[in-house]
Amino acid sequence: MCGLKFGIMLPIRGPSDIPGPKSWILALQYQYDKLNLETVKQTAFIAEALDYDSIWVVDHYSTSQTRQRLECWTTMTWLASLTHKIRIGSLVLCPLYRHPSLLAKMASTLDNISNGRLELGFGACPSYNKAECNAMGIPWVGPATRIKMLKETIEVCKLLWSETHANYDGEFFSLKDAFCEPKPLQKPCPPITVAGWGDRMLRLVAEYADRVNFGGPELVSERIEVLKSHCESIGRAYDSLEKTLSIAVVLKRTRSEYLDDMKKRFIADGGHGNFDDWLGRAEEYYVSGTPEECVEQLQSFLELGFTSFMIRFGDMPSLDDIPLFAKEVIPHL
């Protein structure tokens, strides 16, 4: 696929449970009335058949926005048993949900089950996870503590994946003569992606990650400069980090079809205010339009050094955009 990597975020959640008008982001992303396991499965099959590089699963229990959600690890394991070559990843794991020794064991097991196809995406649990944690009885902590916990989580996992007997004495986690067997098939371990924007998270990226993931197109160029600075300060080559971007795509064959589709989404969002203003806000956040327009928008990210994209297609549960993007967008990049 032209030397670039394209993955698909799987639709493992149901519709928004928010009554009345939804946010324009939700209106763009989710246009279906229930969680559909068949749609999840067929998305994975089509992605593999069209040579997409990867499929990705978010890590949530449930939220105030959506009660219907599939759990991350059991979903990835299910999909590993159904597919053969496509890579399977988490985007992103929350360090508050699982002890890292358990996480390391789960990851090693799934890497073996999938014949070395596991991708591990980590984050530090953004603020909207707070309500989810409170509902589930998971203690919520501030951002600095979450970042420290993420750092220790990655350190513990790497120790267990590399050492015969691991010992660790951290602020939050510890190991005493611990072991994890079998080791992951991928050496030294499954690729680690860390998602984040802030200065402290980008420092962690520079120190521990194989890849950085930005969660949208806003402020990307400025944040890249911060990441470069962190890499320089620790003596790491910036180019050794793969740059990945999560994007949402709304794709139609013609401009007329695209505008008709966006007007339907505008109405689904409540239809308040001016459509052109609403569309302008949406187009700041999304890669959208005709195939030619999407190619042009993606080119700007290639110029910034991005080589991998995790796509949330906006036409779900329809699967039409997946082959259209593969045939009319990717070959022109």
Task: Give residue spans per PLM region.
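N-terminal beta1-alpha1-beta2 module of alpha/beta enzyme domains
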Residues: 1-82, 188-190, 312
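N-terminal small/glycine-rich loop or linker at the start of catalytic domains
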Residues: 1-30, 128-132, 171-189, 255-284
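Flexible, glycine-rich active-site loops centered on histidine and acidic residues
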Residues: 4-35, 95-167, 212, 219, ...
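Hydrophobic faces of well-ordered beta-strands that scaffold small-molecule active sites
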Residues: 6-10, 55-57, 87-90, 118-122, ...
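Short, acidic/polar
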Residues: 35-47, 103-106, 194-207, 290-300
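Conserved, mostly hydrophobic/aromatic
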Residues: 51, 59, 79, 110, ...
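Alpha-helix-loop-beta-strand connector modules within alpha/beta enzyme cores
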Residues: 67-90, 149-156, 323-333
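C-terminal helical cap(s) of enzyme catalytic domains, especially alpha/beta-barrels
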Residues: 142, 154-158, 220-231, 318-333
